[in-house]
Amino acid sequence: NDQMLYEAESLEECIAGEIYKPSWDPQGSTFKWFSEQDGDETVLYANFHTQDPNREKVEINVRRRCFFPEKTGCGYITVHGFKIEKAATTWAPPAAFQDGMIGPHWSKGWIIEDCEITNSKCCGISLGKYYDPENDHYFTKKHLKSPTQMERDAVCRGQYHGWLKENIGSHIIRRCNIHNCEQTGIVGRMGAVYSVIENNHIHHINNMQELGGAEISGIKLHAAIDVVIRRNHIHDCTMGVWCDWEAQGTRITQNLLHHNERPAYCTWAVGG
């Protein structure tokens, strides 16, 4: 019924269906799911409490993205008036490939307008980084370099991958309703340069609190070079707008932001 269930760490936790204390929606957090492998099969369990899954709308999301080019460099595409929802997107850190339910994938001149974007496991819109096999999660995979050093490397290596005004950025995101995504409404590392983000309603981001850390916000950008963020209404998010490294020439103006903080009744999430 358009409500994401909370992932349990064990079948016992799923069956118990107890409140997840960091959640901004305590009662909603009692609806759980759990999965385990049985040979070649994946077995799913869910706690619907008194609701009958045979009568309600139950969806299992496995698609990683909704509208996102497989290759980089597919520029000048307009997406207008769509409802884009429910994708099993993955965590989008700045030192690795960043995906979202929709995004230009390292290209130029996209317009995403008048769309509703909702229920992404991680990010709604990604204006972010391409996949670089020579600089992707090395801290986790090879225990080499800190994530901070990987970010420094990404700035230099971006030149090898066409990070020039002629090729990348200059996107427009406008009049979209972006909500109930669990990492960011809009994320972008380097790929958002020279873009305009305006007149959007961004709300209820990261309210489940299953994810935490330094990449959570209504809008979270690295290298927001000459980006204009204006006339957006952003509320009920874990932080409103966060422009991280390389916020050169960034203009944030005429936005309305409120209630972008953890409610008093919530505990801190792990990593939050």
Model-identified regions with their sequence ranges:
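Extracellular polysaccharide-degrading/modifying enzymes targeting complex plant/algal/animal polysaccharides
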Residues: N1-W106, I111-S126, Y130-L164
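Short glycine/acidic-rich loop motifs that flank beta-strands on beta-rich extracellular proteins
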Residues: R64-C66, A88-P94, D99, K121-L127, ...
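Residue-level marker of regulatory loop/turn positions in helix-turn-helix DNA-binding domains and
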Residues: K71, P94, P104, K165-E166, ...
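Small-residue (G/S/T/A) turn/hinge positions that recur once per unit in extracellular repeat modules
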Residues: C74, S107, I168-G169, A192, ...
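All-beta strand scaffolds that present successive hydrophobic residues in beta-strands
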Residues: I77-V79, W110-E113, N135-D136, I172-R174, ...
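Surface-exposed acidic, glycine/proline-enriched linker/cap segments
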Residues: Y138-G169, I173, L211-K220, I225-I229
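Active-site neighborhood of glycoside hydrolase catalytic domains
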Residues: N199, H204, M208, K220-G272
